[in-house]
Design a protein with these regions (language model features):
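Exposed substrate/partner-binding surface patches
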Residues: 9
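ASCE RecA-like P-loop NTPase motor cores
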Residues: 32-348
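Residues marking helix boundaries in flexible regions
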Residues: 20-22, 30, 53
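Intrinsic-disorder-associated, low-complexity terminal segments enriched in Asp/Asn/His/Tyr and depleted
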Residues: 13, 28-29
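Cationic, low-complexity basic patches in intrinsically disordered or flexible, solvent-exposed regions
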Residues: 3
């Protein structure tokens, strides 16, 4: 959070969930920002109008924490939706588990169908951490299964936040940030295209690869792109449709959103921002610097194991980290690269 940013925490009820609304300074002209459009067949009744007014006033006055109490089914989510519409600020909703987060996401999606309501939770369906048994020199690889749909929604949430729009609600769980890279590196790898602009096709393809999109001219899946002459189809990692960019020499001739099955054009754009295919982004310079630091620490740790009379651990560590560094050199990333976060962005 940036220095000087204040917020308000609103608890729905005990052990339910809480909402954090960033209290950003209001613009001089409120019309300059995107508006939240609350859609509901219901109207505030009973104690709801008073609760909405008090919570809204508290946020505007910079009250750090407010609590909303209510029994199950009393309309707490609807009350908070009205507060969000009144404040008209980007909102982060935190839940203590993925099940409740999914429920809240569905409800807020219904209240704000014309705004960017996004879902950001852990994308693992299954996760087994790596392990090593020195007695038998057995290494058990980390095993996991990533939910592609949740991965898409996570990328969509990140893209919405970086798009500049203000009408964004992100529903998340408290353990959601595992595996995230540096937001600045993610933003620096956003590709902006504009119709009629000079842009070498080959340079554009290299930018796609740098943003971790993979070329696949046969079986196009999310996070892939294909090339047919001057036409480049990109299956955006955070969307359900293709982005088709047609070049005319070194100029962008057209930008279209295309149905991946029928090939029918859904929309045309004058300009478009393509966000990276992976949340863990970094630069080549940062990767080379990180590899150098990893090598130094690897040498020290291997030496320590050997001095302690633990050759099996030394050998296993040498093999594993060396393999990871080779993958970083060749591909720019490796499986479990988040474990090396402290080398890329100085995490403790």
């Amino acid at each position: 959070m940036e220095q000087g940013v204040m917020g308000v925490t609103m608890f729905f009820d005990t052990l339910s969930c809480f909402i954090f609304i960033p209290f950003l300074s209001l613009p001089d002209n409120p019309d300059e920002m995107n508006k939240f459009e609350l859609t509901s067949a219901y109207h505030p009744t009973g104690d709801q109008p008073e609760a909405i007014a008090q919570l809204t006033e508290g946020v505007r006055e910079g009250v750090h924490a407010q609590t909303l109490l209510g029994v199950t089914g009393s309309g707490k989510t609807f009350t908070i939706a009205n507060v969000i519409a009144n404040i008209n600020k980007p909102t982060l909703i935190l839940s203590h588990n993925k099940t409740l987060a999914a429920q809240l996401y569905s409800e807020f999606k219904g209240f704000f169908p014309n705004n960017a309501v996004e879902y950001y939770v852990s994308y693992y369906d299954y996760y087994q951490p790596e392990a090593y048994l020195p007695s038998s020199d057995t290494y058990i690889e980390k095993d996991l299964a990533i939910n592609d749909e949740i991965d898409k929604l996570r990328l969509a949430a990140t893209s919405a936040l970086l798009s500049g729009r203000k009408d964004v609600v992100v529903v998340s769980s408290v353990s959601c940030i595992y595996g995230m890279g540096n937001p600045a590196d993610f933003y620096n790898n956003v590709i902006e295209v504009q119709q009629g602009k000079n842009y070498s096709r080959n340079v554009f393809l290299r930018r796609l690869v740098d943003s971790l999109y993979v070329r696949n001219d046969i079986d196009l899946n999310r996070g892939n792109f294909r090339v047919k002459g001057d036409t480049v189809d990109i299956y955006l990692a955070y969307a359900d449709n293709l982005l088709r960019i047609v070049f005319w020499g070194d100029e962008i001739d057209s930008i279209e959103e295309v149905d991946p099955v029928s090939g029918v054009t859904i929309a045309r754009f004058d300009a478009y921002k393509i966000y990276p295919a992976n949340l863990f982004m970094t630069t080549k310079e940062a990767t080379l610097r990180a590899i150098h630091e990893i090598e130094d620490d690897l040498h020290k740790q291997v030496q320590w194991f050997e001095n302690e009379g633990r050759p099996f651990e030394a050998k296993r560590l040498q093999e594993r980290v060396t393999y990871d560094m080779e993958m970083m050199r060749e591909l720019g990333h490796c499986s479990g690269i988040e474990n090396y976060s402290r080398y890329f962005d100085g995490r403790a």
